[in-house]
């Protein structure tokens, strides 16, 4: 049954750890190359057009963008809180080396140190094999001990006969098991429910673990 989104709102922009939102709300981060479709994916998941600004200009997002959502996993369930974080896209060349280094440090600090971060969605373009930057991002997330969910976006731009092969190419390149990558298209509306189901399960799993094994 599809997740019901109760509310979705922009929270804040942050460039330093002291600006990150406080509280214990489980967080999901979204990362990928510039112009891979992160904003479109966020809007589709939120069931709200315009929540995350979609731009045709790569590299527009230059800070961490936080969004607060509440959802019901089933119609009878009480609303649960979750927060999404949109990270600046990597692989954008038209900025100075110093600016790229600043972005990299900001993103890596967040991915290593954010204690409420439950999973990271790595977004890749289904039309192409994962880039070296995509592979590096996946390796970094694994080394940082983060739960990784891979979403292959823009599947609407592929003939249906090629979609399965495209997903298998992504899974092989990133060392995933068959069926691990989530096919996604904001245009067709496909993949939204499957991705939501994974993210909600990860958030709930972490919450149950914390309740069963509280810190000393």
Curated annotation (Swiss-Prot):
Residues 24-205 form the EngB-type G domain. Gene3D superfamilies: P-loop containing nucleotide triphosphate hydrolases (3.40.50.300). Mg(2+) binds at residues 39, 61. InterPro entries: G_ENGB_dom (IPR030393), GTP-bd (IPR006073), GTP-bd_ribosome_bio_YsxC (IPR019987), P-loop_NTPase (IPR027417). The keyword Metal-binding applies. Keywords: Cell cycle, Cell division, GTP-binding, Magnesium, Metal-binding, Nucleotide-binding, Septation. This is Probable GTP-binding protein EngB. It comes from Anaeromyxobacter dehalogenans (strain 2CP-C).
């Amino acid at each position: 049954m599809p997740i019901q989104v109760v509310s979705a709102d922009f929270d804040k922009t942050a460039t330093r750890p002291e600006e990150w939102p406080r509280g214990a709300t489980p967080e999901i981060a979204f990362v990928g190359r510039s112009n891979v479709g992160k904003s479109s994916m966020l809007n589709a998941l939120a069931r709200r057009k315009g929540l995350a600004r979609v731009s045709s200009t790569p590299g527009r997002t230059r800070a961490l963008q936080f969004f607060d959502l509440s959802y019901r996993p089933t119609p009878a369930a009480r609303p649960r809180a979750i927060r999404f974080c949109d990270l600046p896209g990597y692989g954008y060349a038209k900025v100075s080396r110093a600016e790229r280094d600043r972005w990299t440090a900001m993103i890596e600090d967040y991915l290593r140190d954010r204690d409420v971060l439950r999973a990271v969605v790595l977004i890749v373009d289904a039309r192409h094999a994962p880039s070296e930057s995509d592979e590096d991002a996946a390796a970094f997330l694994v080394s940082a001990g983060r739960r990784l969910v891979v979403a292959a976006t823009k599947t609407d731009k592929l003939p249906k006969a090629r979609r399965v092969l495209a997903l298998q190419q992504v899974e092989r390149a990133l060392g995933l098991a068959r069926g691990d990558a989530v096919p996604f298209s904001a245009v067709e509306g496909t993949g939204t429910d499957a991705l939501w189901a994974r993210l909600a399960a990860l958030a709930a799993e972490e919450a149950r673990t914390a309740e069963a094994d509280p810190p000393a």
